[in-house]
Design a protein with these regions (language model features):
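Active-site-adjacent helix-turn-beta-strand microarchitecture at beta-sheet edges
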Residues: 100-168
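Bacterial N-terminal signal peptides
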Residues: 10-20
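Conserved hydrophobic/aromatic beta-strand scaffold that supports enzyme active sites
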Residues: 56-60, 127, 177, 247
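Extracytoplasmic
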Residues: 54-56, 88-89, 123, 154, ...
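Bacterial N-terminal signal peptides that target proteins for export
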Residues: 1-12
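Zymogen propeptides
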Residues: 21-119, 137-138, 187
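General beta-strand structural signal in soluble alpha/beta enzymes
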Residues: 93-97, 130, 215-219
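Conserved, well-ordered active-site substructure
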Residues: 103-122, 168-180, 184-218, 224-255
Length: 255
């Protein structure tokens, strides 16, 4: 989103990435710092040789320590900003999640704490699925029974599958994405980025400057992309262009 680049300027460490083609060479490894129990943060700036540069924030959530929730918008409207959705939590990191239809209703399956929030499962879409403290990204068709999972949110397209960048439609837009594997979920927000360049950054090995995502899913982007961090050592408010139906909210463990 358009506010991310300006907001990132005051942070001290940037990851500068450059390279060519599928074998991109990243200048620095990601510099994640623990900002709360179970939550680590890094900022990045990516400069593809054949596309527009982009920058943003990544948060690694350790589900063995921190809690991840899918929280719906409240009040008379079916949509709120992520800042409004996260307002009840004194300490949290939150990003937008589900795509939504013309009536503002979340598209795809949406489940939080085992409670069904949206039932329109999209078989061909990807889905972040959390069972206990284990997170993975699967196809909607691979979810026969939503009731056995603690959290589900669907998105499209799957950017990275099994460590491989997928064939993706070219598009330049602000990005919100999630990576998942085992007990680690990574939330990523970015300024305008071309789809494949963004996916290559997500999949790139950490030692060459990527995030090392084995599986990554695109969530709603464009004006929906927004981020809020309310932590004792880090405060961010990166607003989008409109309200959204829900948000992924990471809640740090109490000290």
């Amino acid at each position: 989103m358009r506010y991310l680049k300006a907001a990132a300027l005051y942070l001290s460490a940037l990851l500068v990435v450059s390279g060519a083609g599928l074998s991109s060479v990243w200048a620095q490894p990601p510099r994640f710092s623990v900002v709360a129990p179970g939550i680590a943060h890094a900022i990045f700036e990516v400069r593809p040789p054949d596309g527009e540069p982009f920058s943003g924030h990544a948060f690694k959530i350790d589900l063995d320590v921190a809690e991840l929730r899918l929280v719906s918008a409240a009040g008379p409207s079916s949509k709120q900003t992520v800042e409004q959705i996260a307002a009840p939590f004194p300490a949290a990191v939150a990003v937008n999640a589900s795509f939504f239809d013309n009536e503002g209703r979340a598209m795809g399956l949406a489940v939080d704490e085992g409670r069904l929030m949206a039932s329109g499962k999209r078989h061909s879409w990807g889905a972040l699925v959390v069972s206990g403290t284990n997170a993975r990204i699967v196809l909607g068709s691979d979810i026969p029974d939503h009731r056995v999972h603690r959290l589900i949110v669907q998105g499209v397209p799957r950017l990275v599958v099994g460590g491989k960048v997928q064939r993706l439609k070219p598009q330049l837009a602000e990005r919100t994405a999630v990576c998942a594997g085992g007990s680690i979920v990574t939330l990523v927000v970015s300024t305008k980025a071309e789809t494949t360049a963004f996916a290559r950054f997500l999949a790139g090995p950490p030692e060459t400057g990527g995030l090392g995502c084995v599986d990554a899913l695109n969530l709603d982007g464009g004006p929906s992309t927004q981020l809020v961090a309310k932590l004792s050592v880090l405060t961010l408010s990166l607003p989008g262009g409109w309200g959204v139906p829900n948000a992924l909210v990471a809640i740090p463990a109490k000290r």
